Amino acid sequence: MFVSTFSTGEISPMFFRQFSLSARARLGCAGVGEGLSRFHDTSDEVKVMSVKTAVEKTGNNTPLQILAPDGTVVRPDLMPKLSDDELRELMRRMVFTRVWDQRAISLNRQGRLGFYAPVAGQEACMIGSEAALSKEDFILPSYRDIPQMVWHGFPLYKAFLYSRGHIEGGRIPEDVNVLMPQIIIAAQCTQAAGVAMGYKLRGEKRVAITYFGDGATSQGDFYEGMNFAGVYKLPVIFFSQNNGYAISVPFEKQTAAENIAVKAVAAGIASARVDGMDVLAVYHAVQEAKQRGINGEGATLIEALTYRYGPHTMAGDDPTRYRTGEEQGEWEQKDPLIRFRKFLESKGLWSEKDEEAVIEEAKQAVADAIKKADETPKMKVSELIDVMFETLPPALEEQKAEYLAKESK
C-alpha cells in the first residue's frame, strides 16, 4: 500500500540537517491524542502577568526567551515547572508534527489531500501553546492550526478528511473542545470572545484561545474581538503567530505599528511578545495568560515571532518570489526542534534513539490515519443536506428525495 512506502527519504533535507533522528522507547506514549492529560493541568503557582505592553513588561522590544538558539537557558527564573516526562513529551509532539507535516505535503502533491497549509518552523508555537491548556479549554484555529486541534483530541484521520472536503472531517467529537479551522481571516477572534463570554457568564474556570497570523491583525474582526474581550474582561487568549508574511506581504507593509503586541493597548488588555521558536517561552506565556483569564483579569494578546519554512499553502504559493534563501537560512538556525533537542540532550533527556522511535511512531500513525480516511465511505449529497437543519424544511426534503433517487441508481 502507498502509505507503507513512507520513508525518511520523503522528509525534506531541512528536517534532518543538524537534526538527529528520534525518540526513546516511544517515551511510553502511544498514538496521537493519547497520553495528553499530562499537560492538561494548570499550576496555581504561576506568576500573574500584569496589564502592560511588551515594551513596558521587558523594558525593550525584545521578545521573551527562555532558551537561546543553542539550547542554553537564559531565563531560569521563568522555566515552566514541567517534569522530565513532560519535557520529553513536548519534544515528541514537535518531532511527530514535523514528520506528519512532511507526509501531508507529499500526499497533497500526489492528489490524495486537498487544501493544506504547511506548519514546519512553527511547531513551538503550536505545541507549546496547546500543552499549556486544559482539555476543557476551547481552541478556535485558523487553517494552519490543525496540530493544536489534533493534540487537543481531534482524530488525525478526521483532519485528513477535512482536507479532502469530506463531511466527516467536520464532525467534531463531543468531548473535544475545538471548532473547525476558520477560513475567513480573523473571524475566529470574535467567535473566541463569544465563547469566553459564555464561560464568564456560567462562572466556569476555562479559557478560549484563538490562533491567527500576522495578516489577520489588519482585519476588523481582530479589533472587534479584542475590544469586546477588553470591555467584559473575558478569559480569552488571542495568539498571533507572526511569521513575517501575510501570504507574500511582509509585516512592515501591512501595518505602521512597531509590533503586534502593542495593538492590545487600544483594547485595554494585556500583551506579551515571545520567541515563537522557543517552546518553553511559548508555554510560559500561554500559562500566564490562562491564569489571568481564570482569575478574572481578562484577555491577553500574545505575539509569537516565528517563521514558516514552506509555502503559505500548497495551492501554488512560491515563497522564493518574496523572500530570500539567506533569510530562511537565518531562521533555520533558530529551529525550534534543534533548540529544544540541544536543551534536552544537555539534561540527558533525549537521544538519537529517542528521536528515531518518534519518527517511526509518527510514520505509522499517519499511515493508519490515511488508511482510515481512505476507508471512510464517500460523501453523499443527501448526507450533506441532513446536517443543515435539525428539522429539514420542505424544499430541502424535496431536494434530498431527488438526490436519494439519483444515488440509488
Which stretches of residues belong to each language-model region?
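Short linear motifs in intrinsically disordered, low-complexity N-terminal regions enriched in Ser/Thr
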Residues: 4-7
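Intrinsically disordered, low-complexity segments enriched in serine/proline and basic residues
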Residues: 10-13
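Conserved acidic/glycine
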Residues: 15-124, 317-320, 325-409
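Structural signal for conserved beta-strand scaffold positions within catalytic alpha/beta enzyme cores
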Residues: 68, 141, 273-275
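A short, flexible beta-alpha/helix-coil linker loop
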Residues: 72-73, 146, 243-246
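Cofactor-binding active-site loop characterized by glycine-rich and histidine/acidic residues
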Residues: 99-102, 106-232, 250-256, 261, ...
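A general secondary-structure junction signal
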Residues: 143, 304-306, 388
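Glycine-rich ThDP/TPP pyrophosphate-binding loop and its adjacent helix/strand module
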Residues: 180-375
